[in-house]
Curated annotation (Swiss-Prot):
It comes from Shewanella sp. (strain MR-7). SUPFAM superfamilies: PLP-dependent transferases. PANTHER family: GLUTAMATE-1-SEMIALDEHYDE 2,1-AMINOMUTASE, GLUTAMATE-1-SEMIALDEHYDE 2,1-AMINOMUTASE 1, CHLOROPLASTIC-RELATED. One of its GO terms (cellular component) is cytoplasm. This is Glutamate-1-semialdehyde 2,1-aminomutase. It is an enzyme of class 5 (isomerase). It is found in: Cytoplasm. The gene is hemL. GO terms for biological process: protoporphyrinogen IX biosynthetic process.
């Protein structure tokens, strides 16, 4: 038994399922999860001391790589001044100014402690601002575990949402409508059914929780047009894509302007941080300047702000995003080339510093229903093969992969060589 396996058995005695977030349990791929001892650059090290080239990056935040010296030094310096004050700090102001400078649609921003808190607060604000109750989300998109967001589509296009988890009253879920990602007709159908009741659309601009699904041309701008037509707000959930797809997020990359934006992951530099911001007219509706209540004991925590600021400043380096995109393209297209070489059907998607691959004969994946038809058994086999080769991918066929600036030529080469060997073994076993 490895030390990771022993720790997992020990953890299950005191922690539900042995983990503090379900995907970490390896239920999507089988086997026992790795327990991580440390991380540095492009590598993570498990409790047994084995090194892995990491394409999870703490689920997105580690865009510069693990244990980046500038972030580490900023955190250590901040710790000397105290861990938490429960009062305003200059660091919060600097972070707000940095976010606003990088994302043109954000005129004011509120710091929180997680992505879930950011989306939950943005939706409450949208409902308060519009005085409407219903929200519109998309099948396969994930915006955190708030009650109104853990909702799946009903049996028909016009059916009200149904809870996707026990513990969520149907009275909550009925206010959440679910449309088809990359399908404007499904959105218009819902708006025409509830023309004066929808407070907002919330969307992942690149859906990263059904693997990696970019928007088709015109989709995001079409949502903007419909929101304007029906008086709803557009919330772009950039918790995953913010400062990862481009310096101004996915909204900058695709040229669409939301009313509100939610952020997380990258802005924390590895610390627990979320944020929501947007038009000043809307943001002034939040307490203490407006009637919509939102608060948080650790919001704007000085240690988290220090880490986030250090990372955000580093991301302003000229040419960084072009280099990151080139690395991502090489990995995604390299996986595809290896699969083609061995006659294993695969489709790929990638944008900025995130990518996805699908074991499928479908040439292009643009919707959730296509993702569910992919070969999960092939993914599981490939996953464990890569893990044995020292490459750590997301342990779910429904999660995106992430590159960092720490992934160099050697890491990319070793990863693609490993993929070639694993796919060759898979083909031989068919």
């Amino acid at each position: 038994m490895t030390r990771s396996e022993a720790l997992f058995e020990q953890a299950k005695k005191t922690i539900p399922g042995g983990v503090n977030s379900p995907v970490r349990a390896f239920n999507g791929v089988g086997g026992s999860p790795l327990f991580i001892e440390k991380a540095d650059g492009a590598y993570i090290y498990d409790a047994d001391g084995k090194a892995y080239i990491d394409y999870v990056g703490s689920w997105g935040p580690m865009i510069l790589g693990h244990n980046h010296p500038k972030i580490r030094e900023a955190v250590l310096a901040a710790v000397h001044n105290g861990l938490s004050f429960g009062a305003p700090t200059e660091l919060e102001v600097q972070m707000a100014e940095k976010v606003i400078a990088m994302v043109p649609s954000i005129e004011q921003v509120r710091m929180v402690s997680s992505g879930t808190e950011a989306t939950m607060s943005a939706i409450r604000l949208a409902r308060g601002f519009t005085n409407r109750d219903k929200i519109l989300k998309f099948e396969g998109c994930y915006h955190g575990h708030a009650d109104c967001l853990l909702v799946k589509a009903g049996s028909g296009a016009l059916t009200l949402g149904q809870p996707s988890s026990p513990g969520i009253p149907e009275d909550f879920a009925k206010h959440t409508l679910t449309a088809v990602y990359n399908d404007l007709d499904s959105v218009r159908t819902l708006f025409e059914q509830y023309p004066t009741e929808i407070a907002c659309i919330i969307i992942e601009p690149v859906a990263g929780n059904m693997n990696c699904i970019p928007p088709i041309p015109g989709f995001l701008k079409g949502l903007r047009t419909m929101c304007d037509e029906f008086g709803a707000l557009l919330i772009i959930d950039e918790v995953m894509t913010g400062f990862r797809v481009s310096r101004s997020g996915a909204q900058g990359h695709y040229g669409v302007t939301p009313d509100l934006t939610t952020l997380g992951k990258v802005i924390g530099g590895g610390m627990p941080v979320g944020a929501f911001g947007g038009r000043k007219e809307v943001m002034q509706f939040i307490a203490p300047t407006g009637p919509v209540y939102q608060a948080g004991t650790l919001s704007g925590n000085p240690i988290a702000m220090s880490a986030g600021l250090a990372q955000m400043e580093a991301l302003c380096e000229e040419g960084l995003y072009e280099a990151l995109s080139a690395k991502t393209k090489r990995i995604a297209e390299g996986f595809k080339a290896a699969a083609d070489k061995h006659g294993i059907p695969m489709a790929i998607n990638y944008v900025g510093g995130m990518f996805g691959f699908f074991f499928t004969e479908q040439e292009q994946i643009t919707r959730f229903d296509q993702v569910t038809k992919c070969n999960i058994e092939h993914f599981r086999t490939f996953y464990h093969g890569m893990l044995d080769e020292g490459v750590y991918l997301a342990p779910s066929a429904y999660e995106a992969g992430f590159l960092s600036m720490a992934h160099g030529e050697e890491e990319l080469r070793l990863t693609l060589e490993a993929a070639d060997r694993v796919l060759a073994r898979m083909k031989a076993a068919m």
